[in-house]
């Protein structure tokens, strides 16, 4: 017995010794050749292990460091990660020296299982091809009219569903409803498919949404997990779950592509293809070598995260802000009544949404300001960046080396008094208005839609969707937090998702 105890103790200490040796090796790799303490390079404020420790509040961790060091570094085993809130650096990277910064192998390796060769994960010819096609599609009147029609129907469905909760005085998860509604809309606009996820009648749709959100979070975890490649090789932990989720996504999307191809074969006499996938499929006939089903799958999933998550997440934070700022909610409600001529106590929902024309949406300056203010504080993509393709010097004087990741902190920027004034952390739509007219800021200061040549193609598309949903829901309901004044936290993933949803009560305005 004593011998067994001695052997077990020896084994335990041996394992501990190997672990310590491995950690020492990792730390040596992390700090060698990284110019620690060199004033020409951004100051080192931590390592990837610090991000691991603060992961659940990662964006606030970055914000605290950026308050004292607008540009700083975190050290990882295979590269330095430079973080900045300096708009000069951001413009330098995203526009002035666009060709010197790419997505980079490091980022591409991390996200390729989910995003493949989609527009958010490629450079060069593939990026230009998708950008050109996407730019054309988003500029067509056909897509504009079709998408607005879909958004109006989605808004009406939301009102009817929330009315049921309201009449029974039930608490509901607003984020979940917005995610389901947005998924339905994006599938209809993007792929010509009726998913019926909001009504809950589509098990496949619900499973797809869950798999997509979980994949989003698990992929982002790779940025702070130095052992993710080992876990993927062994097919354990989160990597095993990610593999299952991605397979479900692949099977579902390839099924959508197959179905749409078959439908198009029966519609050959029609030249007007309203949904985006149909027009990409028509394009694929000209270039069957490049535009494979797998390539279309990648394009679809990139479109999904841009369309579903960005709008639904922003609207979730928007309604959270309205609950925290009821005077803002009432100002928006009054603006909606004034510009839709719907002062009657109980307007007809179908007639109301039918009147939400482009001309009406364009008049909603206060609503536009409130949505933009939401994006300032809760950007859909809280952190984004590029990889330096050559040694460079940033406008603030700091050097970066070839291979360094350079990230801009949109979430932190929205909270900086040096950028937005002493009231930076306050939700104040008025900061965007001049005599009641919306005034935009530089995209390198307000970075929610990216900037430069890769600026978001769907910006106007997103604002139209958000305005139609927001106008409709605010016209028919007042909203209150189900848990009183309790704060809502985010879940760390590519997009700024609420952790545990947004439980609300809805009170009919009539």
Each predicted region: which residue ranges?
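Conserved cytochrome P450 K-helix E-x-x-R motif and the immediately C-terminal K′/meander segment
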Residues: 48-70, 251, 255, 351-398
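Cytochrome P450 heme-binding "Cys pocket" and the immediately downstream C-terminal segment
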Residues: 326-328, 406, 459-497
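Conserved cytochrome P450 catalytic core segment spanning the I/J/K helices
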Residues: 139-141, 244-315, 342-357, 364, ...
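Cytochrome P450 heme-thiolate "Cys pocket" and heme-binding signature region
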Residues: 136, 432-466, 491-492
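Cytochrome P450
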Residues: 2-21, 75-82, 142-153, 163-188, ...
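N-terminal membrane-proximal hinge/A-helix region immediately C-terminal to the signal-anchor transmembrane segment
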Residues: 2-129, 150-161, 245-248, 390
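Central I-helix of cytochrome P450 enzymes
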Residues: 182, 186, 246-253, 283-340, ...
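Conserved cytochrome P450 K-helix/beta-meander segment immediately N-terminal to the heme-binding cysteine loop
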Residues: 408-437
